[in-house]
Amino acid sequence: MNTPDIAQVKRFLLNLQDEICQKLEQADGAARFAEDSWQRPGGGGGRSRVLRQGRVFEQAGVNFSHVHGDEMPASATAHRPELAGRSFEALGVSLVIHPENPYIPTSHANVRFFIAEKPGADPVWWFGGGFDLTPFYGFTEDAVHWHQTAFDLCLPFGAEVYPRYKKWCDDYFHLKHRNEQRGIGGLFFDDLNAHGFDQSFRFMQAVGRGFCDAYLPIVERRKALTWGERERDFQLYRRGRYVEFNLVWDRGTLFGLQTGGRTESILMSMPPLVRWEYDYQPREDSPEAALYRDFIVVKEWL
């Protein structure tokens, strides 16, 4: 079947949210997700889940949303002007994980489906998503594992898929005002529809299911490492870059706010604690300097 099946996508996304939350609870070993179901006045709603003050995760949020409306927001029509005048539905699962231990990276993943329709015209639809990793202290084996998992899940869909979406991720998660990468990248894709609904949906499923395979082994490797005030201060400083990107550059944040989405859920990606420091410079040859020099730069990890 190559006509879009919104109900099938929704079933997958709800199950994916359940699976990821269960695996994160197992990895944390103490805290549980609290669920908050909500309705959007303009149409649709969602299921927000947040885990706080766990043994491993300071905060983890895993959101499902399914929103619809009669008119496209400016953030979408600017990107695709042919969508003006169409009604829309947008479904997705989005997650951000902020560990307490600075040696465990922050991670983000998102998978989504979008369809816009108007009478007398074919629907315009696509899939998007990806996952990316933001370490504070870099470990080459973690970066290689992260990218190897991404490569492996892409390979059944074509040898060109990983390099294309790896580059797109590097380009997207770039803080232009700092001329810095947000992290070590991963995968980012959008506007995916060229191979038909079934094939595009299969790829989105592979990315959604691949996230835990990419992230949780890193959590297990790093969660027992001891850390102190120095590492925590640097983690909180680097979290500031996460905030800057999400509020200034992220298309998903802008889309959510412009469509009247639920602000608490949209800003769930924000770290619970963060700090800024004027003109911070890491000490030369320190682990902090190595992050800038060796990790948050565009490079081939495989």
Swiss-Prot record:
Active-site residues per Swiss-Prot or TrEMBL entry: 108 (proton donor)
EC category name: oxidoreductase
Transmembrane segments: none
PROSITE patterns to which the protein is assigned, alphabetical: COPROGEN_OXIDASE
Cofactor(s) needed for function: a divalent metal cation
GO molecular function, one term: coproporphyrinogen oxidase activity
Family classification: Belongs to the aerobic coproporphyrinogen-III oxidase family.
Site features described as Important for dimerization, chain residue numbers: 177
Alphabetic keyword roster: Cytoplasm, Heme biosynthesis, Metal-binding, Oxidoreductase, Porphyrin biosynthesis
Catalytic activity: coproporphyrinogen III + O2 + 2 H(+) = protoporphyrinogen IX + 2 CO2 + 2 H2O
Subunit and interaction comment: Homodimer.
Residues covered by region (Important for dimerization): 242-277
Pfam families linked: Coprogen_oxidas
Highest taxon above the source species: Bacteria
Protein name: Oxygen-dependent coproporphyrinogen-III oxidase
Pathway participation: Porphyrin-containing compound metabolism; protoporphyrin-IX biosynthesis; protoporphyrinogen-IX from coproporphyrinogen-III (O2 route): step 1/1
Residues the record lists as binding a divalent metal cation: 98, 108, 147, 177
Enzyme Commission number(s) from the entry: 1.3.3.3
Binding site for substrate: 94, 110-112, 260-262
UniProt source species: Erwinia tasmaniensis (strain DSM 17950 / CFBP 7177 / CIP 109463 / NCPPB 4357 / Et1/99)
Cellular component GO terms, alphabetical: cytoplasm
Function summary: Involved in the heme biosynthesis. Catalyzes the aerobic oxidative decarboxylation of propionate groups of rings A and B of coproporphyrinogen-III to yield the vinyl groups in protoporphyrinogen-IX.
HAMAP family assigned to the protein according to its UniProt record, in alphabetical order: Coprogen_oxidas (MF_00333)
Record gene name: hemF
